[in-house]
Amino acid sequence: MTTAGIDLQLGFETALQNLGLSPGAAHALWVPLPMLLMVIAATLGVMVMTWLERKISAAAQQRIGPNMAGPQGVLIPIADGIKLLTKEDVLPSLADPVLFTLGPILVFLPVFLCYLVVPFGQNLLISNIAIGVFFLIATSSVQPIGLLMSGYGSNNKYSLLGGLRAAAQSISYELPLALSVLAVVLMSNGLDTVGIVEQQSGLGILSWNVWRQPIGFVIFLISALAETERIPFDLPEAEEELVAGYQTEYSGMKFALFYLGSYANLLLASLIAAVLYLGGWSFVVPVETIAAWLGIPLDNPFLQIGAAVLGILMTMVKAFIFVFLAILLRWTLPRVRIDQLLDLGWKFLLPVSFVNLLLTAALKLAFPTFFGG
């Protein structure tokens, strides 16, 4: 069922028009708001993730974790932010000022731009474009340039090695990740992120793509971990080898951009996994079935609003399951070597993702009803 949902742009522009503004003026006032909403939502998500990482890491090591800044340490992300904002922004004497400054921006900006096309609920997304998946892949591919610029512009051998590792790792795993996503696109017959979720909403949990794309799902998770530089793929900033990798010479707000970009990238990958494979805002049981159990008509406004609100929570719960797993893996798996990492990407994941794509195409021709023909 397609619920009425929440259309932020339509609601905002309609409210302004009711106050007497022309449609053009109302639309002009809306244009800067998506970027602001995107930054606020992603920043809040990063704050929650940093607190979760500290508490889960503490539990894994039988520690208490942060407990001084607010109840259960919930204000520790704000304290971290204030600390980073007040630190001096140092420019090394031998660093290239242009590359050194642009690097963090090119690492941070593409991640936040990707949030423009990620649906958090029915009609609750900032920009619903027909090529949403293509936009995600194309925008995220800019990040390796920023990593290289940061490593090279620092004029530090550890930073350079970290930047080269990060770029090689990102490029190696972008291909299998893109091919695994392409298999989902093939089944949904479109690049629209909202359409992909709606294609999974027919039979509840049985309609989710994870059952039809188990191989692609595993490839996506492994590639996403490598793209976000999480353990066991955190080679670009391996402390024992490279101090802090391409971040070695950074401090203050520039370092904060790397910090924000890293966690925002993990949350983005988790949201994309929830949207592509776990049905996004779709419920485990279809809304029609729930309405029949409760004896409520489908056009009931309370059902519409409740389904929309709970759908947003459903998307976030699914996404934070992946965040939780990524944090647990940090204390479970050892770091791999650089040759093992590249071999896994080029010699195993890439061929398997090609086979998975061809298999999906064949199954779509053979079983069009089940595979989205």
From Swiss-Prot:
GO biological process annotation, one example: aerobic respiration
The protein's assembly and partners: NDH-1 is composed of at least 11 different subunits.
Gene Ontology molecular function: NADH dehydrogenase activity; oxidoreductase activity, acting on NAD(P)H, quinone or similar compound as acceptor; quinone binding
Name assigned to this protein: NAD(P)H-quinone oxidoreductase subunit 1
Membrane topology note: Multi-pass membrane protein
Reaction it catalyzes: a plastoquinone + NADH + (n+1) H(+)(in) = a plastoquinol + NAD(+) + n H(+)(out); a plastoquinone + NADPH + (n+1) H(+)(in) = a plastoquinol + NADP(+) + n H(+)(out)
Family according to the record: Belongs to the complex I subunit 1 family.
Keywords: Membrane, NAD, NADP, Plastoquinone, Quinone, Thylakoid, Translocase, Transmembrane, Transmembrane helix
PROSITE patterns in the cross-refs: COMPLEX1_ND1_2
EC code(s) of this entry: 7.1.1.-
Catalytic EC class: translocase
Source organism per UniProt: Synechococcus sp. (strain JA-3-3Ab)
Transmembrane spans: 29-49, 64-84, 98-118, 129-149, 177-197, 202-222, 267-287, 309-329, 348-368
Cellular location(s): Cellular thylakoid membrane
Main function: NDH-1 shuttles electrons from an unknown electron donor, via FMN and iron-sulfur (Fe-S) centers, to quinones in the respiratory and/or the photosynthetic chain. The immediate electron acceptor for the enzyme in this species is believed to be plastoquinone. Couples the redox reaction to proton translocation, and thus conserves the redox energy in a proton gradient.
Disulphide linkage map: none
Gene Ontology terms: cellular component: plasma membrane-derived thylakoid membrane
Main localization of the protein described in the UniProt heading: membrane
